Amino acid sequence: MKINKKFRNKSLAFVLPFMILVGCGTTAQEKGQEDSIVKVSASESNEEVKDTKDGENNRLPNVQILATGGTIAGGGESNTSTTDYKAGEVGVDELIKAVPEMKEIANVNGEQVVNIGSPDVTNEILLKLGKRVNELLASDNVDGIVITHGTDTLEETAYFLNLVVKSDKPVVVVGAMRPATAISADGPLNLYNAVKVASSKEARGKGTMVVLNDRIASARYVTKTNTTAPDTFKAEEMGYLGTIADDVYFNNTITRKHTTETDFDISTIEKLPQVDILYGHQNEGNYLFKAAVEAGSKGIVYAGSGNGSMSEVADEAAKEAEDAGIEIVRSSRTGNGVVTPKDYISANSLNPQKARILLMLSLAKTEDKEKIQQYFDEY
């Protein structure tokens, strides 16, 4: 992988001095929850002997890092550039070298899938990534997967994997809000924590997880809530699956179907149906619906106000699109709450961007409206 030399040295020079890999003290609230919290030591995750590469510890879990670019691999002109930088400047080998402490908890190997900003992730990249994850997890020599990813569309990729991965082994998606060259870059510790979670046997069966800022969230519920703050990823009303301090602590689980429980098999899929998102607003017209239909959309997610509300103009345009064979999903632009059923498919509690992911996979499987609604209610 060819790395921009201007950023290579800066990455290690500024990242490593700010690595703080020590656990925080347990709060009184955490102590009160001890009965419901599962404490996991990453080093205890797998005791059986593994076939390993030269130089690896065969008593540590094997974690594969799949790098896709993003801010975590970004580089800026100076160490104070936290917003003016280029994503995807640092390769996976440099990311791993910047956190040598990972070798104490896992045998880590890296693979560069792409090296781009996350707004450039396409359906083709999603399929490539999903198939590669399934291929790796089918091996007895891989215990968990960590995917480094840009934060702008991280939740979409994570939810996609939550629906298509066919393994109970941990899959963790991780990113950063500050580039690798910045003062107090958050990427190295986030990456270390992600490997720690992926190494944990208690992380099995929890679907795809997102790890940032010492928090473990389900891909189903997590969303980006701030443009630049390091604590941008929130699980909102549903809460986090767990936290990371000296060890990995799980205090919650996910009840929605995921990974091995879903109907989606992408092994033979080469192309996903086109699904677009239309944003509801005052004084809207019908031309965006018409444009989407003419452009070949197979489904439309409408991000309505409040409870997925539609204006009369939008409702009429949606009915015309539906008559033309286009599936319509009502979601909400509010970010929280369940969109109650009315006329069209309800996104349930999925935000518009995740509703798009589920509708694409649903349409690749069926055109039955009731079945698609069932997917939204269960997944």
Predicted regions and their residues:
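Short, acidic/small-residue loops that bind anionic groups at enzyme active sites
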Residues: 158-189, 195-199, 323-332
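ATP/nucleoside-binding phosphotransfer catalytic cores, i.e., glycine-rich phosphate-binding loops
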Residues: 40, 50-51, 57, 287, ...
